[in-house]
């Protein structure tokens, strides 16, 4: 199994995902500032993995605070939280994990040393829980995949695999479960412009585990569906609004429209922590815009002439009506049940 975030020898070990697939490298993170930089530069990426990394980042920041006075410590810890919150605005798991760490700090009534110890334990719990969550998502997703006489061919976008979580994955968790049970023939993976997470990361994960994978460009999906090559689409999510609108890597919305046009089921796989019940719908989800160099430059080669303007949103929002079901660790739900009044049933 692939584990992108590991606590070991009093530091955090991150698989450097910017170097994959050509180089497997592990980065040691000792300070909260370094963790913030790792999240911002996408050394670690994927909403659940970012949440785990941010939790450890909170502990690293707490460890750096020298005061033994409780109130002063909590004030300094808030500065660490602000640093980490500023890294990636769309992934709600980041904010959820930071909030959980802060609650741990405020609820601990002992010494500052005890607060720090409890923060580490909470970060480790978030890590372990996410792994269990992803395995449950995989099995719940397997249960609602189309029943066909032949093995399934699935399509995914970006990377919602082990690299994007504590391990196993959300969308790729469903793929892994299908492969484990002998129900998967092949995975089709969108390359996912502009950062090519599908080409670089999803295919790498599949090769590591022997899962048959075919890479296609993003604009080939409609053709593949028309040819009858795809039984279902399974993607992850970085934030889901209360009405079921789901923000995921840019290009997901287009894929959902194409799937709807070809009567191909479209599933979103994500932990309950990704559902933001404070947002009524997807129009309220903040969309990160990244450096346009990701669009116009490959390596040291510039692809465009001078004078061209660029627009580089990292995410788009898929309307709930295009989503067949949202797969969580607690089961699969039609998007319309994810309302504030049904939060208890979902959570």
Swiss-Prot record:
GO molecular function, one term: S-methyl-5-thioribose-1-phosphate isomerase activity
Residue numbers binding substrate: 45-47, 88, 197, 248-249
Key word Iron present: no
Record: active site: 238 (proton donor)
EC numbers on record: 5.3.1.23
Any single GO BP term: L-methionine salvage from methylthioadenosine
Sites marked Transition state stabilizer: 158
Pathway info: Amino-acid biosynthesis; L-methionine biosynthesis via salvage pathway; L-methionine from S-methyl-5-thio-alpha-D-ribose 1-phosphate: step 1/6
InterPro entries linked: IF-2B-related, IF-M1Pi, IF_2B-like_C, Initiation_fac_2B_a/b/d, M1Pi_N, NagB/RpiA_transferase-like
UniProt keyword Iron-sulfur, yes or no: no
Gene3D superfamilies attached to this UniProt entry: translation initiation factor eif-2b, domain 1, Translation initiation factor eif-2b, domain 2
Record field: catalytic activity: 5-(methylsulfanyl)-alpha-D-ribose 1-phosphate = 5-(methylsulfanyl)-D-ribulose 1-phosphate
Keywords: Amino-acid biosynthesis, Isomerase, Methionine biosynthesis
Functional description taken from the UniProt entry: Catalyzes the interconversion of methylthioribose-1-phosphate (MTR-1-P) into methylthioribulose-1-phosphate (MTRu-1-P).
NCBIfam families: eIF-2B_rel (TIGR00524), PRK05720.1 (NF004326), salvage_mtnA (TIGR00512)
Homology family: Belongs to the eIF-2B alpha/beta/delta subunits family. MtnA subfamily.
Protein name: Methylthioribose-1-phosphate isomerase
Lineage, top ranks: Bacteria, Bacillati, Cyanobacteriota, Cyanophyceae, Nostocales
């Amino acid at each position: 199994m692939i584990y992108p975030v590991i606590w070991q020898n009093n530091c955090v070990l991150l698989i450097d995902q910017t170097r994959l697939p050509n180089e497997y490298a592990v980065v040691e993170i000792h300070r909260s500032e370094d963790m913030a930089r790792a999240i911002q530069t996408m050394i670690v990426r994927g909403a659940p993995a970012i949440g785990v990394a941010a939790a450890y980042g909170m502990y690293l920041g707490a460890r750096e605070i020298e005061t033994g006075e409780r109130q002063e410590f909590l004030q300094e810890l808030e500065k660490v939280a602000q640093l980490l919150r500023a890294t990636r605005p769309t992934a709600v798991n980041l904010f959820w994990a930071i909030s959980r760490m802060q609650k741990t700090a405020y609820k601990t009534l002992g010494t500052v040393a005890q607060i720090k110890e409890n923060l580490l334990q909470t970060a480790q719990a978030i890590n372990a829980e996410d792994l269990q969550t992803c395995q449950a998502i995989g099995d719940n997703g397997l249960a609602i995949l189309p029943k066909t006489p032949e093995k399934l061919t699935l399509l995914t976008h970006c990377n919602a695999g082990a690299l994007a979580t504590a391990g196993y994955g959300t969308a790729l968790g469903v793929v892994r479960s299908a492969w484990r049970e002998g129900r998967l023939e092949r995975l089709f993976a969108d390359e996912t412009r502009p950062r090519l997470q599908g080409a670089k990361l999803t295919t790498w994960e599949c090769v590591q585990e022997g899962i048959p994978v075919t890479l296609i460009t993003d604009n080939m999906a409609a053709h593949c569906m028309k040819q009858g090559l795809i039984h279902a689409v399974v993607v992850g999510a970085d934030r889901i609004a209360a009405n079921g609108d789901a923000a995921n890597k840019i290009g997901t919305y287009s894929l959902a429209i194409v799937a709807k046009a070809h009567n191909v089921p479209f599933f979103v796989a994500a932990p309950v922590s990704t559902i933001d019940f404070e947002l009524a719908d997807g129009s309220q989800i903040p969309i990160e815009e990244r450096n346009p160099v990701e669009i116009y430059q490959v390596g040291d080669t510039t692809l465009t002439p001078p004078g061209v303007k660029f627009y580089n949103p990292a995410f788009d929002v898929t309307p709930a009506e295009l989503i067949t079901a949202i797969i969580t660790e607690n089961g699969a739900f039609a998007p319309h049940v994810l309302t504030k009044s049904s939060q208890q049933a979902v959570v």
